[in-house]
């Protein structure tokens, strides 16, 4: 059994953020392959299913990004899933918009969600890095990742999500190079994302060393909040299945 994780912040407030592209990818996988419904378990929204005969558990943490390892670790221990059988989809500032890269192990690259998973499970899990581009200056990163995708970004975002969902069976078969090749052939990454003006974090959020956010004093998200956000994100971002 594989554990397939999408990273993001829970709730409609963050549903369209660039930082939530991992959630969007999990939603695209669920819809393309008929997996669901999602239910609340392991401090996350989870759904069991199969892709090309391979059993998997889709998981989107209901913790905030910086505590993603709590949910992933809990699910992995319960199902006795080794880190080598865990695939995490997440946003990547250092890749051009629409470009993806896959790697196993390595460092967190400044991504606090990945860092927290490493703290709970070690570094041996797989990462599918979904390029969102860089705003051009480190002072703009927080505003950029917590900003919603612009309409102009739909030109590469929806095709990337579609391609990931179309060819994900290759990842489950242990063929990451073929997966990357197929996604690249199906998409045409944008050359560069435009930087946004620097802004302060939203009220109730704290800046972290890696540019992610933690919500201060916020109530826990409702059990159905993330499922609704996943559905909303997919309806907005996926090209296929809409006639």
UniProtKB/Swiss-Prot annotation:
Primary enzyme class: hydrolase
Protein name as catalogued: Peptidyl-tRNA hydrolase
Enzyme Commission number(s) of this protein: 3.1.1.29
Gene Ontology BP, a term: rescue of stalled ribosome
Biased composition (Basic and acidic residues): 189-206
Entry GO terms, CC: cytoplasm
Organism, scientific name: Rhodospirillum rubrum (strain ATCC 11170 / ATH 1.1.1 / DSM 467 / LMG 4362 / NCIMB 8255 / S1)
Keywords in alphabetical order: Cytoplasm, Hydrolase, RNA-binding, tRNA-binding
Cellular localization per UniProt: Cytoplasm
Site (Discriminates between blocked and unblocked aminoacyl-tRNA): 9
Keyword RNA-binding carried by entry: yes
Spans annotated as Disordered: 184-225
Listed SUPFAM superfamilies: Peptidyl-tRNA hydrolase-like
Membership in a protein family: Belongs to the PTH family.
CDD domains: PTH
Main location: cytoplasm
């Amino acid at each position: 059994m594989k554990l397939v994780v999408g990273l993001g912040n829970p709730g409609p407030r963050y549903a369209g953020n660039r930082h939530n592209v991992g959630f969007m990818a999990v939603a695209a996988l669920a819809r393309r392959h008929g997996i669901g419904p999602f239910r609340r378990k392991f401090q996350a929204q989870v759904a069991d299913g199969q892709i090309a005969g391979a059993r998997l558990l889709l998981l989107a943490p209901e913790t905030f990004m910086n505590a993603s390892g709590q949910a992933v670790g809990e699910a992995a221990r319960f199902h006795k899933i080794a880190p080598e059988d865990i695939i995490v989809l997440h946003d990547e500032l250092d890749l051009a918009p629409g470009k993806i890269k896959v790697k196993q192990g390595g460092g967190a690259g400044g991504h606090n969600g990945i860092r927290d998973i490493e703290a709970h499970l070690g570094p041996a899990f797989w990462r599918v890095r979904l390029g969102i581009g860089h705003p051009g200056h480190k002072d703009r990163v927080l505003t950029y990742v917590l900003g919603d995708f612009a309409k102009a970004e739909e030109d590469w975002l929806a095709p990337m999500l579609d391609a990931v969902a179309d060819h994900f069976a290759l990842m489950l078969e242990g063929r990451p190079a073929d997966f990357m090749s197929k996604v690249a052939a199906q998409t045409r990454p944008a050359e560069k994302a435009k930087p946004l003006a620097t802004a302060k974090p939203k009220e109730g959020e704290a800046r972290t060393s890696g540019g992610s956010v933690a919500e201060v004093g916020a109530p826990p998200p409702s059990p159905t909040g993330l499922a609704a956000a996943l559905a909303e994100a997919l309806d907005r971002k996926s090209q296929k299945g809409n006639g």
